[in-house]
Amino acid sequence: MIYKVFYQEKADEVPVREKTDSLYIEGVSERDVRTKLKEKKFNIEFITPVDGAFLEYEQQSENFKVLEL
């Protein structure tokens, strides 16, 4: 399953909405995704599964790239 992860680059700073980035990553569960991203030192705000019509919509974006770890 593909997950969309909303995160801040620096885990040691207070989260600011305007600095939130997102990425797409494949995993079997939210826990699996968190484990894969642990070494990145991101401040993960939210992880949501992407499938069905939502996935089709996201794939239309030029920024849609699934992170390979």
UniProtKB/Swiss-Prot annotation:
Keywords: Cytoplasm, DNA-directed RNA polymerase, Nucleotidyltransferase, Transcription, Transferase. It is found in: Cytoplasm, Nucleoid. Disruption phenotype: No visible phenotype; growth, bacterial fitness in competition experiments, RNAP distribution, global transcript levels and transcription initiation in vitro are all unaffected. GO terms for molecular function: DNA binding; DNA-directed RNA polymerase activity. A non-essential component of RNA polymerase (RNAP). Has a similar structure to bacteriophage T7 protein Gp2 (AC P03704), which is known to bind to RNAP in the DNA binding-cleft. Unlike Gp2 however, this protein does not inhibit transcription initiation. In vitro reconstitution experiments show this subunit is dispensible. The keyword Transit peptide does not apply. HAMAP family: RNApol_bact_RpoY. This is DNA-directed RNA polymerase subunit epsilon. Monomer. RNAP is composed of a core of 2 alpha, a beta and a beta' subunit. The core is associated with a delta subunit, and at least one of epsilon or omega. When a sigma factor is associated with the core the holoenzyme is formed, which can initiate transcription. Induction: Part of the rpoY-rnjA operon, transcribed constitutively. NCBIfam families: PRK13667.1. Its EC number is 2.7.7.6. It catalyses: RNA(n) + a ribonucleoside 5'-triphosphate = RNA(n+1) + diphosphate. Belongs to the RNA polymerase subunit epsilon family. Pfam families: RpoY. One of its GO terms (cellular component) is DNA-directed RNA polymerase complex. It is an enzyme of class 2 (transferase). GO terms for biological process: DNA-templated transcription. Its main location: cytoplasm.
